[in-house]
Amino acid sequence: MSYRTWLAVCILLILSMVSIGGFTRLTESGLSITEWKPVTGVIPPLSKNAWQKEFDKYKNTPEYKVRHFSISYAEFQFIYLVEYFHRLVGRILGLVFFIGLVYFFVVGNLARESRLRLCFALVLGVIQGFVGWYMVKSGLLDVPAVSHYRLALHLFCASLLFMVLVYEFLSPTVIKGSVFKWHLVGCSLMFLLSMQIILGGLVAGLKAGLICSTFPLMNGEFFPAEIFHELSLNCFNDPVAVQFLHRMSAFLLTFICLVCLVISFFYDRAFRARVFLVASMMLLQMFFGVLTLLFHIPIDIALLHQIMAFILLGICVSFLRVRSG
């Protein structure tokens, strides 16, 4: 397997993890496994007795006592397997990345910068695993839901790992002239998209998408009254305020992309084409976001909305791989 093929496999596994993670959240499966066993946890329950033990552990959680007290044995098996599969793909990703890392460090003629990026990605991957359990643990104590802050952190770590590997995967593009405009647009949009992904994690954690399911107004108001009551850091605990911020951030991102598109017509064709791609994808992403809201978070559209955010990040990273020659 070549170096870039290995990176591509890792990137696809990250996207798979993001998709499965979103499905896990939307089906309320994430708290079904009450323990974190990085090694022995790879083996699922194989007997009826083992399944019953896992079910009994789940019955002691706040989620079961408050929300899922009527769940059947078969329904528990479903949500358990969803969470199990999410963790399994994470283990596969970690194994594939670590084996490839060792192999290419030994036999590959990697530049120092590539080695540093891969080591950073390894550290990020380890942190991401701990953050995942840190998030799940928050929903096993008193409240029957994970901390929305920890969920947002978990999603942000995934996006950061994704950006690092995409950057390493993409081959540098050499152009004539200055690359300032490329890097300015890429860095600006990457930063704003990262903030938007964090806000999206907060929206998901608070289930804020089920509140004010109207567009463009929020239950008849552009500025909901709730946001004026929460003009502090506490606004991140208020579902209405968080959804408002997520909407405004989406408007800002789309506006900036369209402004960049207009400005790009004064530059070369390659730059114009890349900006057009970003602007088009941003409009499509906003469209999926609106559909997710209006149809009360259907799983298929919600997952597409989440994956599109990562695809947009990947396109923005490509701006940083342009070099002057």
Swiss-Prot record:
Chain ranges passing through the membrane: 6-26, 88-108, 116-136, 155-175, 184-204, 248-268, 275-295, 297-317
EC number(s) stated in the UniProt entry for this protein: 1.17.99.9
Any one of the GO BP annotations: heme A biosynthetic process
Cell compartment(s), UniProt: Cell membrane
Main enzyme class: oxidoreductase
Cofactor requirements of the protein: heme b
GO terms, molecular function: metal ion binding; oxidoreductase activity, acting on NAD(P)H, heme protein as acceptor
Bilayer topology term: Multi-pass membrane protein
UniProt cross-references to InterPro entries, sorted A to Z: COX15/CtaA_fam, HemeA_Synthase_type2
Any one Gene Ontology cellular component term annotated for this protein: plasma membrane
Annotated binding of heme, by residue: H246, H305
Pfam families: COX15-CtaA
Keywords: Cell membrane, Heme biosynthesis, Iron, Membrane, Metal-binding, Oxidoreductase, Transmembrane, Transmembrane helix
Catalytic activity: Fe(II)-heme o + 2 A + H2O = Fe(II)-heme a + 2 AH2
Domain of life: Bacteria
Pathway the protein acts in: Porphyrin-containing compound metabolism; heme A biosynthesis; heme A from heme O: step 1/1
Self-association and partners: Interacts with CtaB.
Record's function text: Catalyzes the conversion of heme O to heme A by two successive hydroxylations of the methyl group at C8. The first hydroxylation forms heme I, the second hydroxylation results in an unstable dihydroxymethyl group, which spontaneously dehydrates, resulting in the formyl group of heme A.
Family: Belongs to the COX15/CtaA family. Type 2 subfamily.
Official protein name in the record: Heme A synthase
Organism listed in the record: Neorickettsia sennetsu (strain ATCC VR-367 / Miyayama) (Ehrlichia sennetsu)
